[in-house]
Amino acid sequence: MKDQYKVLYDPIKIGKLEIKNRYVLAPMGPGGMCNADGSFNKRGIEFYVERAKGGTGLIMTGVTMVENNIEKCALPSMPCPTINPLNFITTGNEMTERVHAYGAKIFLQLSAGFGRVSIPSIVGKVAVAPSKIPHRFLPGVTCRELTTEEVKEYVKAFGESAEIAKKAGFDGVEIHAVHEGYLLDQFAISFFNHRTDEYGGSLENRLRFACEVVQEIKKRCGQDFPVSLRYSIKSFIKDWCKGGLPDEEFEEKGRDIPEGIEAAKILVAAGYDALNGDVGSYDSWYWSHPPMYQKKGLYLPYNEILKKVVDVPIITAGRMEDPELSSDAILSGKTDMIALGRPLLADAEIPNKIFEDKYDKVRPCLSCQEGCMGRLQNFATVSCAVNPACGREKEYGLKKAEQIKKVLIVGGGVAGMEAARVAAIRGHKVTLIEKNGYLGGNIVPGGVPDFKDDDRALVKWYEGILKDLGVEIKLNVAASKENIKEFGADEVLLATGSSPRTLTIEGADKVYSAEDVLMERKNVGEKVIIIGGGLVGCETALWLKQQGKEVTIVEMQNDILQVGGPLCHANHDMLIDLIKFNKIDVKASSYISKKTDEGFVLNTNGEESIINADSAVVAIGYLSEKDLYSEVRFDIPNARLIGDANKVQNIMYAIWSAYEVAKNI
């Protein structure tokens, strides 16, 4: 381990509680981790214990509701201590005792709830808020204003929940949140809070709710019981449901930095022992849940400001897994602790691996949010695109095979590599053959843009892991019925992937696939048409625009990003906003019919116009490569399709399907 990284393992205190190192499991939505009575289930316990086992010093649970009457949530959705305190203490004790066995501490994150950003599938179409304001997700729905008495009930519920948490063995609590536009944050922001009672008006009044919460907890649990606060110094709200991009000039409608500084001082003076800082809101979700289009360490400039104005530890998340970045952030005084959320979904052992000088063995988070936020927004259990066992560690972990088999895998894309990894871990003798001279499949062209560097890192990780596991890899070997039969495998997995759909345009010769352009096999010129406004088309357009090209997207649907996915809201919204911000022209409900001497002919709802361009780049989806399977299916009955060869889907389902099949060989 580099000397610089040693600071990541220095102890630190939150209040009087000592944490063994600087790593924090960032609190994340606990989908699938609780019982109907608000207590923790086995999945939830195993999830948090696994991260403690991986070396994280402070475990923070996902959001836990303090009550379920004022803002009634469908159960089971989130834990809640006050529904059945006895069961909560029983299951909580099992969790905290096991977490403590690894030398970690654990905080329970307590929440007042969602308010105007309530998830309809959880709360329904009735929402509460500080004032009568529009709902974030339900057009035409106005939130009910909470009464003064209800606010005071919330404060008492926070105190009661913290007492229960302390009895369950939690070392402290985190308050959720003067952050991201949740209910407590809505009270703190004048854009949302129009009240005239003691909880509205001045900044001090708008923060009264959050201040009374920490004071109530300290009164019940003792002044030494640590309480941290999830806090956003800036909201990045342009308007209702509209966020501001990096480097974009706009009028902040939420909390801006000067008020954020004053608010932080007031909150710390009220008794908060640490600030878990970030920026953003549900109106600018791509700040709170940063996609791959955001810079790594995006919160550091803002938390550095907090560090200078308050005297409590500052915790920073935001794509911070690289030890070079995280250690420098601490040494340069920008933060005190490093919170990892999604990276610890991808690999629970990041702190241990860095300590053991094995950072190259860390499975990278892609910031795709397909397995975490993408699933939570669809009311599914939390997991990870690149780690299928995440959130179901015990029931879905890998075990040694009872019978060792000879396994042949055809294709070295992500499905093939994952199947090889899983089969080898289970003890099988694995050979992987790949027709190209490299591994990675479609992720290789997809990983070309700078903002997709973690895709490239995933391929590199697989290469290293497969080598460590002793998988025999044969590149530049095309599979055939003859050489598969000659190999004599007990199991054959065909991960032959998918190939881009093609398109012929009358009169045009410079029509290229997005793959050929990304791999720099073709020169597109200076003016480019992208045919297809799905994920590949939009990301290719953004990449070309960053090179100074003039880019037009032509899409048959009525908007871009309508087909495929589903994408997490944050990724979807940021990509659309980046397309607009970068002045990439979008022609929706349109198609290119032909090319003439004047240019490409655009047909929009029956009306024709001309687009002058040097070339057209086709990104209209992929087709499964099933030819080999069709050829061998009757002669080699133990051959099975996996990944895109079985069904074209996103990277998560390619990996998950490969894991499932290889797990059961």
Curated annotation (Swiss-Prot):
Underlying gene: fldZ
GO molecular function: 2-enoate reductase activity; cinnamate reductase activity; FMN binding; iron-sulfur cluster binding; metal ion binding
Function: Involved in the fermentation of L-phenylalanine via a Stickland reaction. Catalyzes the reduction of (E)-cinnamate to yield 3-phenylpropionate.
Enzyme class: oxidoreductase
Name of the protein described by the UniProt record: Cinnamate reductase
Enzymatic reactions: 3-phenylpropanoate + NAD(+) = (E)-cinnamate + NADH + H(+)
EC number, UniProt record: 1.3.1.-
Binding positions for FMN per the UniProt entry: 109, 230, 319, 341-342
Residues at which [4Fe-4S] cluster binds: 365, 368, 372, 384
